[in-house]
Amino acid sequence: MSELLVRTLSGLIMIMLALIAALQGGYVFALLVAAAATLMFFEWTRIVRGWGFGWQAAGFVYALLPALALLWIRERDLHGFMLLLWVFIVTWSTDIGAYIPGRSLGKRKLAPTISPNKTVEGLFGGIVAAGLLGGAWVLFTGLGQALLLFAPIFAVAAQAGDLFESWMKRRAGIKDSGTWLPGHGGALDRLDGLVPVALLTAVAQMAGLT
């Protein structure tokens, strides 16, 4: 089975699980979020082993804050589920929009010393995909119009989160944060873009912009 097929199938399974848990909300969604945060913290501590206590403590914050943000978004009001799906759409479309153009059209390296496979073309592909799909969801659901602007901006934040995790792995001398997810590596590899998008969306929600 090709790597792309494995990546696609495992990605679809993860998306289905996330959507089912998000739809259920309550304890079901909280359990999934807690499991993901635990895996993220475990992988973080493995990556930063020997870097000092500050990095270990930062991992706890890194895993906890986006988990709380996702729970806040989902349970805060009647629009929580729709807003949570917007978070997923922006994050996933950024990832896919960056992956496909980056693989097929990418020529200019975005950050060659950190992540040699990431390209400028992939960056813009992710921004465009998030802007279009995230914007379409806003118009379809009637969420706050500010999210039309936030979608491409948060796409940049998602890719910055990806680059930050890539920098950590390069410093630690490892390729993937874990081996839990076939074709994707570990939880951090899959959720590094979700972290900033969840946090920024929670802030926007608290500011009444969603």
Locate predicted features.
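C-terminal-most transmembrane helix of multi-pass membrane proteins
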Residues: 197-198
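Membrane-embedded alpha-helical bundles of polytopic integral membrane proteins
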Residues: 1-156
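Interfacial loop-to-transmembrane junctions
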Residues: 171-194
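Pseudouridine synthase
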Residues: 100, 167-170
